[in-house]
A protein has these predicted regions:
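Vicinal oxygen chelate
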Residues: 31-33, 40-43, 83, 89-145
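Eukaryotic phosphotyrosine signaling hubs
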Residues: 4-6, 76-80
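Core segments of cupin and vicinal oxygen chelate
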Residues: 2, 8-52
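Short secondary-structure subsegments characteristic of cysteine-rich extracellular domains
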Residues: 70-71, 78
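Active-site/binding-pocket entry motifs
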Residues: 49-50, 61-64, 130
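A contiguous binding-surface segment within folded domains or other stable secondary-structure elements
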Residues: 66, 79-80, 100
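A short, acidic/glycine-rich surface segment
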Residues: 39-40, 63-70, 132-133
């Protein structure tokens, strides 16, 4: 039997990334700091999905010698994470109010794309049907998603 566990993304700023996913509705379910390995693992899940479908945020600590931390770019080559949300318009409004660009607005009331602080593409899908509504219906795409 195969069971999905999680998707892992590397992050440069754990606090900013956790705050981003909290705006979507995920919650931190556990955290592990490895002094020996010099990394932190943070697991997030939608309410009721703990242990079923999680996102693992991996933060590799800066080198002890003071050299620059690894720069994680090119998040688009990961593909994307997808979440069903209760109200796509409210979720996108909360993300936009927090300074996140809605790269593919929910013009159809069904689907939107945003990026995490680390450039990971996140697809938002409406749970159920919503009529197309302004200002979203007439917004153009911004950048890649």
């Amino acid at each position: 039997m195969v069971k999905y566990l999680h998707s892992m993304i590397r992050v440069a700023d754990p606090a900013a990334t956790v705050a981003f996913f909290e705006l979507i509705g995920l919650k931190e379910v556990r955290r592990f700091d490895s002094e020996q390995g010099r990394f932190t693992l943070i697991f997030l899940a939608a309410p009721g999905q703990e242990g079923l479908a999680e996102v693992e945020l991996t933060y590799n600590w800066p080198p002890e010698d003071g050299s620059p931390a690894e720069d994680y770019t090119g998040g688009r080559n990961f593909g994307h994470l997808a979440y069903r949300v209760e109200n796509i318009y409210e979720t996108c409004a909360a993300l936009a109010a927090a300074g996140h660009i809605i790269h593919r607005p929910p013009r159809d009331g069904h689907m939107a794309f945003v990026k995490s602080p680390d450039g990971i593409s996140v697809e938002l899908l409406q749970d159920g049907y919503l009529e197309p509504a302004e200002p979203w219906a007439s917004m153009a795409n911004t950048g890649s998603w």
